Amino acid sequence: MFSRKKPEPAKRRQHDLSQFGLTEIPDDFDPSAGYGEDDGGDSDLEAELAAITGGEGAKPKPKPKAKLLPASDLDKMIADSLRDVSDDDDDDNLESDPDLLGELSGIGGLEEAEEEEPVAQPPAASEEPVQTFLPTTTVDTLSIIKQRLEMYKQAEANAKTAGDSGKARRFGRGLKTLKDLHRQAAAGKSINVDDIPPEVSVKPIGGQAPPVPAEESPAPSTPASPPPVPSRAAPDPPTPGTPVEPTTSVAPTSPPNPLVTQMRSRQTDYKAAALQSKRSGDISTALQFLKVVKQFDVVIKMCEDGQEVDLSDMPPPPAEFLEFLKKMQEEAAAEAVAEPTAAPEPTPVAPAPVLAAATNMLEALQQRLEKYQSVEAAAKAENNSGKARRFGRIVKQYEDAIKLYKAGKPVPYDELPVPPGFGPLPTADAAPVAPTPSLPTSPTSPPPTASTSAGGTPSSSSATTPTAPRKAPSPPKPKELTTRTSGNQQKNNIAEQQMKLLLERQKEFKLAAIEAKKAGEIDQAKEYLKIFKGFDSLLNAASSGLPVDLSTLPVPPSQRDNLEASFAIVSAEECDPTDDICEIGVRMEEQLAKQLMMCKNTRDHHKAMGDVAGMNRFENLALTVQKDLDLVRYSKRKNEPLPKFHYEKRSFNIVHCNTDLTDSELEIVVVRGISYNVANPKDVDTYVRVEFPLLNDESFKTKTNVIRDTSSPDYDERFKVDIQRTNRQFQRIFKRHGVKFEIYSRGGFLRSDTLIGTVNVKLQPLETKCEIHDTYDLMDGRKQVGGKLEVKIRVRNPILTKQMEHITEKWLVLDA
C-alpha cells in the first residue's frame, strides 16, 4: 500500500530519421538480402511450405535473369573507378555551383556556414547515374517563390479593388507565407516545394484578358519564359530536363535589357571570383569582390527602375580588377597631392540646404529641435536603438526648453547641446545666426560605389562603379540680407533693450575687474567680479521675458570713481555769503552734501549686509544727488542764477544689521557703572561677572577686569558667545531667559569679594531687534541697592525677523 512506485523505464522516442537528413530505414530491413530480391522471396517460401505439408503448391515463377553488361562497358567502368580524380577539377565545377553561391551571397561573404567537402564517388554500375542534390534551395525554387509572390500581390490588389475582403485576407495569408519562404530561401535554407502556396488565377481589373504576343501560344500548357535570375542566386540557367511550372503572366514579358544582362554577367564573374578567393584563403580579396557584387545590386536596381546608367565606369573582369584598383588608388593619391595647388572643380553633389536665419530664441530652438528629430528618425530607420534613445533624450531637452520659454520661465541654455553646423543661440544684442551648411550625414549620403577600397576608405572618384549621371546643381539664388519680421514682433522692444543694457553694464564690470587686477588692487577686483557674477540672474530673468528694475543696477565703475572724487576742499573766502542768493546757494549745497553723505552711508551699510539691490538703489540716488550738487557749485562759481528746486518727502526703509558680527555670534558689552552705592566710593575696586545660559543646563561665564578707586567705573569690555540661531531650543532660551550681571567689590587682605548688586537683562527683545542698549538698576533680590550698569547686547540680525526702520526725509530736488 505504502510501497514506492516503481520507476517506469525510459521510453525510447521514435524519431523520424528524415529530419536529420537521413533516409528512413524500415523495421523489417535485412542487410543480408540484396536489392530487388524481395519480390520473389515470398512465392518461393510458399512453395516450399506447401511441399513440406504434402500439398501441391504452385510452381514458382522463374526469376528474371540479370542483364549482363558487355565486356567493353565493364572494362570502361573498371578503368574509370581506378582513375584518380583531382581536387582541382571539383573546385572548378563548384565555382558555378548555385547552392554555394547563394549561401555565400546570403551571408555577405563574412559569416559563411561550414562548407561540406564533396566526396568523390565512383560512377554507379548503371547506364543512367542518379544525380543527388544537397538539401538547399535551388534557383528554380527561388524563382518559383518570386513568381508566386507577384501573383499573390496582384491577386490581393485585385480582390481589394473588387471589394472582396474574404479573398483579400486569404491572399494576404498566402503572401505572408511566401515572404517567409523567400526569406528562408535567400538564407540558403531547405525549402519543401509542397509548402509553397499554389498558383492563383490573376485577371486584370477590367475583366479583359491581357494581350498576348503573336509569337506565344495562348495555351496554358506552354511554359512561360523563365524570370530574370535574382542577384542572390547563381546566374546559370536551369537544365533542360528540369521542368518549369507554367505561370500566368499579368503583363506581356518585355525583352531583357542588354545593360542589365551585361551587368549581371559581370556580377556573376565577381561572385565566382569571391568564392574562389575564399577557398584559397585570400579573405581580403574575397571581401573586395563581395563589395563590388553588392554595389552591382544598387546599379542594377537603378537600371531596372528606368534611371540612366553609364557603363563606362563599370569594373573590369575580376582577373584585371586588382591592377585596376591599384591604379585608381595611385590616381586618387596624386589628385590629393595636387589638390592644394590646383583649384578643384566643384563636385556635382548638391549642397546641403541652408536653414533660414533665426530671428528670435524660439525659432532657433525650433530649428535645433527639428534637426535632432530628423537624426532620431534616421537612427530608428537604421534600427540603431542606442543612437535613437540618445537623440530622443536630446529632443526631450529641447521640447522642455521650448515649453519653459513659452511660459516665460528661465531656460538652461548652457545645458542644451548644439547640433553640428549650428552656431550659438542668438541673444538680444547679437545678430541672428544662421546654421552653417555642413556635409550630408550618413543617412542622406549617396549609394556606395565600387571605388571603396579593402580598408573601407572610398576613392576620390566613382570610376569603378557605373553610377547614374547627376545633373549639375543650379547656382543658388542670392538671398536677401534682411530678414522679414512679422508685424506683431518689435525689433527693439523693452526686453531686448534691457538685455542690451545688462550685457553692456556686465561687460564694464568685467573690464574694470581685469584692470583692477593688473593694478594690484585685488580687493577691488574681487568686488567687481562679484557684481559681474550677480548679473547672471538678471540676464536669465530678462531672457525669460521677466521685467528687471533698472534702478537697482550697480553704477558703472567710471561713474563710481567720479562719485567718490566729488568732494573738493574750498577756502573760507569762497564760503562767505555776499548776498541772499549766495546764502540760498550755501544752504542748498549743505543740504545736498548731507543727502549725499546719507546715501553713501546707507549704500555702504547695504553693501556690508550683502543686499546688492539696496546698495545699487542708494548708489544711483547718490549719483543723482552728486549731479545736483555739482550743478549748484558750478552756478555759484560762475555767478549764474541758481537752478530751480523744490522739496519732496521721501520715505526710506532702512534694514538694521550689525555687519561686524556673523550670524552665529552674540556680543555682550559691559560699558560702564554709574554711582555704585558703596561705603568708600573713592577707594572701591569693582569688577563684573557675566553669565549667559546655553543648551543642556550649561552657561557661558566670564568677568571683566578690575577697575580701581572709583564708584563709576568704565569697563568697556566685549565678550562674544557662539549661538545657534536655527536651533529651536536656543530660540526658547532667547524667549524665556536672560543674561545675568553681578557687580563685585574687591576685598582686601584675607577678605572675600563683596556683592554690590545684580542685573538681569531679558533676551526676548533680540527676537525683533538686533541690539539691546540700556542702563539697568542694581538689584538685591527685588530691592534696588542704588547705582546703575550700562550694558549692550548685539546680534547680526534679529532671531525671528529683520529689523526694518521707516524714515521720512525732506529731500531737495533740482528741477530739470
Curated annotation (Swiss-Prot):
Region span, DM14 2: 265-317
Keyword Flavoprotein found: no
Pfam families: C2, CC2D1A-B_DM14
Compositionally biased region (Polar residues): 483-492
Positions of region (DM14 1): 145-200
Biased composition (Pro residues): 220-243, 434-449
Annotated region (DM14 4), positions in chain: 502-556
Ranges of compositional bias, category Low complexity: 122-131, 424-433, 450-471
Entry note about domains: The C2 domain mediates interaction with monophosphorylated phosphatidylinositols PtdIns[3]P, PtdIns[4]P and PtdIns[5]P, and is required for membrane interaction. C2 domains can mediate membrane interactions in a Ca(2+)-dependent or -independent manner; the l(2)gd1 C2 domain lacks three out of five asparagines that are crucial for Ca(2+) binding. The C2 domain is required for protein stability and cytoplasmic localization, and is essential for l(2)gd1 function.
Quaternary context: Interacts (via DM14 domains 1 and 3) with shrb; the interaction is direct and blocks access to the surface involved in shrb polymerization. This interaction may be required for the ESCRT-III complex role in multivesicular body formation.
Record protein name field: Coiled-coil and C2 domain-containing protein 1-like
Organism taxonomic ancestry: Eukaryota, Metazoa, Ecdysozoa, Arthropoda, Hexapoda
